[in-house]
């Protein structure tokens, strides 16, 4: 079933390559899957990075199953590079192992604009189809034990903050970190070299975080502006609007073939792309 489709100069409620099971069902989670995966070449020449296999299934499917297990069955996936492969594999209503059926929407940035809109641009593009409070996570992260806690979401929803992010101890490829964390559980925009942690990409946001007065992009990003997320987060931290938690479980940014191989070394065959 096709959602209202939109051309690149119209609002998402008008008409484009938006696809989903229902216009009225808002997604409670967004999986970021639009990146090119430059450092993953040649593996990503024919396969979107979130679709590379980790321990026998597509990398992004680990998150989808965890979201569904936590009761988040309505998800939105943004795509650009080789995006049709993702929708072709999952469809609109896939039956995932152990967690059952989920409902998917797609924002095909590549088809609408010819390029990915970066994180903030992609979220604003999808905003009309996202719930008032929603999860966001990158499809190329492997964190099999992360819990999309209903309690965390409810506490955040009742808080004055506009975003809650999860930080992780700095991995070898990002030794300087990204953001600080106060004893009161607030994310801090600190100058380096402060004691910083790495942004995991896991986060909860309220729609107000992406208000057009803050982002400079109208609802639905009809012009296809590409915009990064970090400047918005830093500005919101300076306003005291971003809380944070430290996650110490297994977490890997699967950004290179070497890291993918390390995850799959117990069964190297699992690192092959999906046929």
Predicted features, each with a name:
Residues 28, 73-75, 103, 162-163, ...:
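Residues at the starts of beta-strands that form the adenosine-phosphate
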Residues 40, 86-90, 213, 263:
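Hydrophobic packing residues within well-ordered alpha-helices of enzyme cores
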Residues 2-6, 16-86, 148:
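N-terminal glycine-rich phosphate-binding loop and ensuing alpha1 helix
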Residues 29-30, 54, 87-104:
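Short acidic, glycine/proline-enriched helix-loop-strand junctions
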Residues 94-177, 182-183:
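Conserved beta-loop-beta/alpha segment of the NTase-like Rossmann-fold superfamily
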Residues 134-135, 142, 146-157, 170-173, ...:
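Catalytic-core segments of class I nucleotidyltransferases/pyrophosphorylases
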């Amino acid at each position: 079933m096709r959602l209202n489709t939109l051309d690149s100069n119209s609002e998402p409620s008008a008409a484009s390559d938006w696809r989903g099971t229902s216009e009225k069902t808002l997604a409670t989670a967004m999986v970021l899957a639009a990146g090119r995966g430059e450092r993953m070449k040649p593996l990503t020449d024919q396969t979107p990075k979130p679709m590379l296999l980790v321990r026998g299934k597509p990398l992004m499917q680990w998150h989808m199953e965890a979201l569904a297990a936590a009761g988040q069955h309505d998800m939105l996936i943004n795509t650009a590079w080789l995006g049709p492969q993702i929708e072709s594999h999952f469809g609109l209503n896939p039956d995932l192992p152990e967690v059952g059926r989920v409902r998917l929407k797609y924002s095909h940035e590549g088809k609408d604009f010819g390029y990915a809109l970066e994180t903030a641009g992609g979220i604003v593009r999808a905003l009309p189809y996202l719930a008032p409070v929603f999860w966001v996570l990158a499809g190329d992260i492997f964190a099999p034990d992360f819990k999309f806690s209903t309690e965390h979401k409810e506490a955040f929803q009742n808080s004055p903050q506009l975003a809650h992010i999860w930080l992780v101890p700095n991995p070898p490829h990002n030794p300087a970190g990204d953001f600080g964390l106060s004893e009161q559980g607030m994310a801090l925009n600190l100058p380096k070299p402060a004691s910083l942690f790495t942004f995991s990409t896991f986060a909860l946001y309220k729609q107000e975080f992406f208000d057009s007065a803050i982002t400079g992009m109208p609802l639905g990003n009809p012009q296809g502006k590409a915009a990064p997320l970090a400047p918005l987060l830093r500005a919101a931290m300076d306003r005291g609007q971003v809380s944070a938690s430290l996650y110490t479980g297994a977490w890997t940014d699967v950004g290179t073939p070497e890291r993918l191989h390390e995850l799959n070394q117990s069964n190297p065959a699992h690192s092959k792309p999906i046929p």
